[in-house]
Amino acid sequence: MAPAESGVSPRRNPSQLSWMNLSSNLILAYQSFGVVYGDLSTSPLYVFPSTFIGKLHKHHNEDAVFGAFSLIFWTLTLIPLLKYLLVLLSADDNGEGGTFALYSLLCRHAKLSLLPNQQAADEELSAYKFGPSTDTVTSSPFRTFLEKHKRLRTALLLVVLFGAAMVIGDGVLTPALSVLSSLSGLQATEKNVTDGELLVLACVILVGLFALQHCGTHRVAFMFAPIVIIWLISIFFIGLYNIIRWNPKIIHAVSPLYIIKFFRVTGQDGWISLGGVLLSVTGTEAMFANLGHFTSVSIRVAFAVVVYPCLVVQYMGQAAFLSKNLGSIPNSFYDSVPDPVFWPVFVIATLAAIVGSQAVITTTFSIIKQCHALGCFPRIKVVHTSKHIYGQIYIPEINWILMILTLAMAIGFRDTTLIGNAYGIACMVVMFITTFFMALVIVVVWQKSCFLAALFLGTLWIIEGVYLSAALMKVTEGGWVPFVLTFIFMIAMYVWHYGTRRKYSFDLHNKVSLKWLLGLGPSLGIVRVPGIGLVYSELATGVPAIFSHFVTNLPAFHKVVVFVCVKSVPVPHVSPEERFLIGRVCPKPYRMYRCIVRYGYKDIQREDGDFENQLVQSIAEFIQMEASDLQSSASESQSNDGRMAVLSSQKSLSNSILTVSEVEEIDYADPTIQSSKSMTLQSLRSVYEDEYPQGQVRRRHVRFQLTASSGGMGSSVREELMDLIRAKEAGVAYIMGHSYVKSRKSSSWLKKMAIDIGYSFLRKNCRGPAVALNIPHISLIEVGMIYYV
């Protein structure tokens, strides 16, 4: 059989495949400049001024400048080049990077999650099996120790939230620091520009940056990579020019002997200056956090071939210039730029600062969405700004909060050195946390020895600890800002997670017994009404208490009932083919099903608006699959709760016994409106006539029908499918709990503060669950419930 006939594409030779991989990685490497390296590449604007501020001004000499450059060179080599490129980029979660990716890996390979909604079926997800299978992972004593102690698992969650809150702090500090630093060049050439005028211009740029976030960056994203590349090439040649013109001997400073000499001369003052040196690697975490948009090869190529050499040459050239112009340290970058190219470089620097700020803002949105997916952030509005670029999101509430805080930083400090102190602490803390989780991954996921993990952790913590300790010395000089921001965001995230856990625990312990459910019938005055009732809860098993409340207050429920649970699993993405997990709750005559809708922590929830039709198709496929199972007849008379199957609505379109057709129904204007004398109704009539001159309203409606091949199925299966179709035609109602969560009277004062004040405030001021799930308001039934947790 020919390849075309068999459906198998012709095999490509190895040279073709290698060329395709090379070209693909080169394209991704090019695109990564605008997303990953914007922040890191603008560091030369403020590193040397921040390093030589404070007591180090007493050591303004050539040896100190050479030593500072040597420190910057080895910092760039050890942290971005060795730690991130060689080690961390190998620890991805299905291609995703960042602290949450490492935590997700740990949650899959060890039972670290505090929310007990995991199921065995989740482990069958294709993304779940990435890396060593959980079936083959040997239960090490360290892993068992973590799983047994809830306090340790809580501590791990707190560390993750601490890191996430620090990243949010980066989203506040980076725009203020980058924009102010790029604009500082105006004062180098225009002496009459005051600090106040510079601040006003910076605020205008910052307001414009945040105000345009709702438009999405995809319209101008194609410019991001060229801007950063032009910036890197510019600073490379400026650095090369300064080396040749001012002091070619600076090349010798790559030797670590200059670091020893530097500390021997400067002593404690030199150690404190490390808080400025670490600014040379701010933005490095973006190489790992944005891994999901690229490949590890593309990020490695971009950094090793372009970014690293350009930054090293620029810092070397700036140091060569400063060694002969010690008075230019406060504005070292712009003073080192040759006059003929000053204005082009100034424009490119400002644009590069905006690109770097944009990348950090986008990362902040992504981190908050991941926190929300893991149940650690209140429900917020997530707007997807691009139909073509997956994961490009905008969060209005967070955007305006970031803008207000960023403006407060710029106006309050007015000094890039103070903001740099805060920014350096935030970045180094995130790196510190990433190193810690990487060590855990080495033991738990990679199954390497604890000695190797301890060696990795100890080596990097010693290096990073030196920088962090120096940065912490500047807490009183602006360094307190990231801790205040982190404390606020972390408290909000943990309180929300704690309240969510307690609420889930209440639901779990107050599930309705199956015996009660089986006893529902006409003898109790219960009526089954036409339609499908979707009962939403967070329970993945059992019948939620809101259903009993609903039936108690309104003794009727729908002919078809589906208990729906929308939950997140510790993987970045769940494919549409694996999204729906369908099962049966009661014997067949009850027409009760369970649907678990699974999303990854980076997935988009219900964006297509076709949830009802996908659900009906999946249930129909489940009924068909169950009928073909020879063992199903043996268990038909008993409860099938707990038996779940993965169903694909996409697959059912081609193989299902249901056919889907879209019909256009025509509704005519109500005759009561036409004959009424009411002014209001008459105005409505005029609206109808303007929009539909014929008095017709056209509506699209999806209908399901059994295929011709369904005649061979059993009568009971056909009847069940017809009941499902008729119920869908009758309409779909959404039943949700309107919850009031309160602490018990016997609770401690701390718990009362967390639940009655903190969680209650967040719940009242966040989006409702119905809005977050895009549930049509006209079809919503809310059942009031009080949760005493």
Curated annotation (Swiss-Prot):
InterPro entries assigned: K+_transporter (IPR003855), K_trans_C (IPR053952), K_trans_N (IPR053951)
Tissue and organ distribution: Detected at very low levels in roots, stems, leaves and flowers of mature plants and strongly expressed in the roots of potassium-starved plants.
Location (main, coarse): membrane
Superkingdom of origin: Eukaryota
Ranges per topology, Extracellular: 54-68, 176-195, 241-270, 322-340, 414-424, 472-478
Cytoplasmic side, ranges: 1-32, 90-154, 217-219, 292-300, 362-392, 446-450, 500-789
Gene Ontology MF terms: potassium ion transmembrane transporter activity
Induction: By potassium starvation.
Membrane topology: Multi-pass membrane protein
Residue intervals passing through the bilayer: 33-53, 69-89, 155-175, 196-216, 220-240, 271-291, 301-321, 341-361, 393-413, 425-445, 451-471, 479-499
Cellular compartment(s): Cell membrane
GO cellular component: cytosol; plasma membrane
Modified residues (Phosphoserine): 9
Protein keywords: Cell membrane, Ion transport, Membrane, Phosphoprotein, Potassium, Potassium transport, Transmembrane, Transmembrane helix, Transport
Pfam families with a match to the protein in the record: K_trans, K_trans_C
Function according to Swiss-Prot or TrEMBL: High-affinity potassium transporter.
PANTHER family in the record: K+ POTASSIUM TRANSPORTER (PTHR30540:SF83), OSMOTIC STRESS POTASSIUM TRANSPORTER (PTHR30540)
Family classification: Belongs to the HAK/KUP transporter (TC 2.A.72.3) family.
Protein name: Potassium transporter 4
Taxonomic source organism: Arabidopsis thaliana (Mouse-ear cress)
Gene: POT4
